[in-house]
Each structure stands twice: as C-alpha cells, then as structure tokens.
Design a protein with these regions (language model features):
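Conserved PLP-enzyme active-site core in the AAT-like
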Residues: 68-268
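PLP-dependent enzyme catalytic core of the Aspartate aminotransferase-like
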Residues: 106, 115-117, 313, 329-380
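Glycine-rich phosphate/pyrophosphate-binding loop
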Residues: 25-26, 33-54, 58-61, 330-355
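Conserved N-terminal alpha-helix of the aminotransferase class I/II PLP-enzyme fold
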Residues: 30-79, 84, 100-109
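C-terminal core of ALDH-fold dehydrogenases
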Residues: 3, 7-21, 306-346
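Conserved small-domain helix->loop->beta segment predominantly found in fold-type I
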Residues: 257-325, 342-348
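N-terminal glycine-rich, Lys/His-bearing helix-loop that initiates the first secondary-structure elements
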Residues: 1-42, 49
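Short, well-ordered beta-strand elements within core beta-sheets of diverse protein domains
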Residues: 238-247, 295-302, 358-362
Length: 380
C-alpha cells in the first residue's frame, strides 16, 4: 500500500464487536487477570494498554521499523533512550539541535558522566573524525531545529556501521510522510508526537521507532521501568492525527514555500533557511533524501533582536507560542524561547542569533500567510 493509504489502514480494522471504525479508548489503569500468572495480554497501563498498542504498531509500520514505543513527551522518549547509556558512554551529537535536547544531554553529562561531543554533521568528514574514538550512539536531527540543516543519513549510517555504533535520528520535523530514516539505515527514530503526528496542538507525546525486534524488547523494558507513558486518550488523538498526516504535510509544505519565497531577497532579511529553496546549501540532498521540504521556515532578520520583536508583534496570522506542527501557524523566537537554556555564546556560535525567528507554517491559505509576512516586514 502507498503511504497515504497506510495512514488510514495501518492501524486496526473496524471493531469486530461493535463495528466502530475508530480505535476504542481503553481508559483503564488496570485489567482483570484470570489468575496471578494468567492474563489477556494486559495487566497495568504503564506496562501496556490496548489503545497505545495500536498507536505503537501504526508508528512502527509508518517508519518501516520492527515496532515502536509511545511516551508522554518527546523528551520522555529521549530520557528513556538515554537510560540505556550508563556512565562513561559516549554520544556524538549534531551541534544544531533543539534546546530541550541539549539541556537533557548536558544534565546527563554533568550528573551521570555521559560524554557528549557536538559536531557539525553537514560535513561527513567531521563525523568520520569523531568516530575515530569509540562511541556508543550517533544522535542526529535532520532537518535540525531551528536552522533546518540536513545530515546525509546514508553517509552517516555508513560511517557508524564501521564502528558498530547505533544511529538515532530525530525525525520530528520531517515525519515519516517526508523521510523514513530506518529505510536509510538508522537504528532508532525519535518523535515528538506533539508536533506534526498529532497535528492539532492538543496533545503532548513522544515515540521511539526501532529497526529491530531486539531493540524493541530492550526499550520496552525501559519504557515500563521509566514509566513516561502517554494516556490512552492522548494515544487516540495521535491516531486521529495520523489519518490526515499526508494531506497536512503537503499543505504545510505549500504554506512554507510561499512564506520562504516572500522572505527571500527582502532588504530586512539577512538569511532564509528552508530546504525547499534552491539557495539552501543542501537543497540537492533534500531532494534526494526527502519527499518534501516540511512546514518550517527560519528567518534571520537584519535588525537583530529589535527587528525580530517588531516583526513578531506585527504578524496577525502567526501566533507567538512554543511548539510547531499544528494546523495553525505559530511563530517562535528561539533565543528567548525554545533555546533559552543554551548559553548565548554557544547558541550564537551555532547560528541561533537574537535576530532569528522560526515560523511554523500552518494549513491556512498560503497566499494569506505570505501577505501576513510581507505586511509584518513592511512595518518592522
């Protein structure tokens, strides 16, 4: 089946008892057992829940993996991933990444002796050099948050395979609608299901998808032990969101393309970051590796922080808010919002300046969003 069809049918057939076409929400914390050593597959909803099981099967299928596990947030998924790496383990991470990920990496580095090296993975030679010393995990965002840099996933996996190093990819910005890292060789895929997978800004959730059944078993134990699991209702909402993921991602892409083209060349704009632009340094990689360019556009304004704030305040259709990937358009100032935990010197070294603005382009009419951006620039 093609991807859009799988979004509808890779979950569960109509309920055999009632004929309901949607997955039931099993709002139960515990389940009756036939005997102390005999049950029907579920005993306690931290360990497993029927609604969650359907979501996990669907996400595993959509990511072309052996299975997946759902969590109560993207950072909950990341925390469970890190629980597999004891003191002294070494992670080689992309240097341009979500501020919350950086914060958790740094906490584990200081408190638990985890070694984390941040490198520019747009250059495969940098990763090759980093892997000359033993590493336990290569951690990638592609596209990155917020600068939308891409990592050549096939090349990164090939380098990691030489040293038998696991590769984990945060696929939140692309989603499996646009990019499937396991098909490119990755071992683990991470999602904040809060974003495009849920798609309606009404849940908090996360997920890990895995290349092998062995990894599913290893992390299922940790999922239960750590306990950062989503509610059945949140699982249902993600399942609902998956139905429209394909059409939404195409709409997001059209909106983002219109906004990016509006920003390019404007006298108040220093740079526009969007993989769909031919001027993007990795546009050719995006065309080869992805099935679209996504709904995020990041712009560096010439007026610095003052220019960014003036622009943000003049937007009418973009709501100033954390998060991204909902049907409504949102605007974020990374330096003071999503990346506020990163020291100024460090974030600026990676390009997260005070003039940087991240636009999550929703599924409104692209022409209206372009007009809104144009008017905000005119008044900024």
């Amino acid at each position: 089946m093609r991807f859009d069809t799988r979004l509808i049918h890779a979950q569960q057939p109509p309920d055999p008892l009632t004929g309901a076409v949607n997955v039931p929400i099993y709002m139960s914390s515990t389940f009756r057992q036939e005997a102390p050593d005999r049950n029907r597959g579920y005993v306690y909803s931290r360990s497993g829940n029927p609604t969650r099981a359907v979501l996990e099967a669907a996400l595993g299928d959509l990511e072309s993996g052996a299975g997946s596990l759902a969590f109560s947030s993207g950072l909950g998924a990341l925390a469970t991933l890190l629980a597999a790496y004891p003191t002294g383990s070494r992670i080689v991470s992309v240097d341009d990444l979500y501020g919350g990920t950086w914060r958790l990496f740094e906490h584990h580095r200081r408190q638990f002796g985890l070694r984390v090296d941040y490198i520019d993975m747009t250059d495969p030679a940098s990763l090759a050099t980093a892997l000359e010393d033993r590493a336990d995990l290569v951690y990638i965002e592609s596209p990155t948050n917020p600068l939308l840099r891409l990592v050549d996933l096939r090349a990164a996996v090939a380098l990691a395979r030489r040293t038998r190093t696991r590769v984990a990819v945060d696929n939140t910005f692309a989603t499996p609608a646009l990019q499937r890292p396991i098909e490119l060789g990755a071992d683990i895929v991470l999602h904040s299901t809060t974003k495009y997978l849920g798609g309606h800004s009404d849940i908090i959730g996360g997920a890990l998808a895995f290349r092998s059944a062995k990894l599913v078993r290893e992390f299922a134990w940790l999922q239960n032990a750590v306990g950062a699991v989503p509610s059945p209702f949140d699982c249902f909402l993600v399942l609902r969101g998956l139905h429209t993921l394909g059409v939404r991602m195409r709409a997001h892409g059209k909106s983002a393309s219109a906004v990016a083209e509006t920003l390019v060349g404007h006298r108040k704009v220093r740079a526009v970051h969007y993989p769909g632009l031919p001027s993007h340094p990795q546009h050719r990689l995006a065309r080869r590796q992805m099935d679209g360019y996504g709904g995020i556009v990041t712009v560096d304004l010439a007026g610095g922080r003052r220019g960014a704030m003036s622009f943000i305040q003049r937007l009418k259709l973009f709501t100033l808010a954390e998060s991204l990937g909902g049907v409504e358009s949102l605007v974020d100032h990374p330096a003071s919002m999503t990346h506020a935990s990163v020291p100024k010197k460090e974030r600026e070294a990676h390009g997260v300046t005070d003039g940087l603005v991240r636009l999550s382009c929703g599924i409104e009419d692209p022409a209206d969003l372009a007009d809104d951006v144009r008017a905000a620039l005119r008044g900024a």
